Amino acid sequence: MNTEVMHSTSTESDAQEKPQAMFDTSAMRVLAVLAEKEALTPDSYPMSLNALTNGCNQLTSRDPVMAMGEDEVREILQHLIQEKFIAEVNQAGARVSKYEHRLRMKWSLEQDKLAVLTILMLRGIQTAGEIRNRSGRLHEFASIADVEAGLQFLMDKYPPLVVRLPRAPGTKEARYASLLCGESYPETAEGAAYAASAAAGVSRQDRIAQLEGEVGALREEVAALAAQLQQFRQQFE
């Protein structure tokens, strides 16, 4: 697996056509875990190689779930240290080196923006509501509007760190995704696939509602026929 951090040297027009990857998915996972654990378990932060590897392979709050080895994580750490996204910390009396992220300094992020970005890095595509529900221990957002303000800040960075995806038919909220791995979400690809999936779901719901209405109408007709039959019988009693 290639863990090398990549930087863009393309022109602005090239960046608009396709986002340039800063990391691969494994490097992004390492950074996201450091950002997450800093907030969730400050007493165990900075993190050792073993703890960081376990965090990368965690089964909960991760999409996708990964299976990374310590050698792979160690190699990623060395690349990220060279690029100054991570710092190695040698604490007095500690037997092992520990590591901390430097995302705030690199991208001038306050904790609310870092929390939003961390959720997208760990969980993939999310709505603003989902980000708010899942970031409580990273940052307590008072409203979805506060989340959207953080998302807008990340989208306004150059190059942008986050993208807003097209709102699919039948959905109320836009969805957002990280651009750190050079993902591209054109309407003809991911956006269209999601829209088609959602549209299919809406179509199925409409069909179910139609069938339920037809069944209800048939029941009424049967009840009316039963009443007429009862009246007919009463004429001969």
From Swiss-Prot:
Gene3D superfamilies: Winged helix-like DNA-binding domain superfamily/Winged helix DNA-binding domain
SUPFAM superfamilies, per database record: Winged helix' DNA-binding domain
Ranges where the record places region Disordered: 1-21
Ranges annotated as biased composition (Polar residues): 1-13
InterPro entries: DUF480 (IPR007432), WH-like_DNA-bd_sf (IPR036388), WH_DNA-bd_sf (IPR036390)
Lineage top rank: taxon: Bacteria
Family to which this protein belongs: Belongs to the UPF0502 family.
Name of protein: UPF0502 protein HEAR1280
Organism encoding this protein: Herminiimonas arsenicoxydans
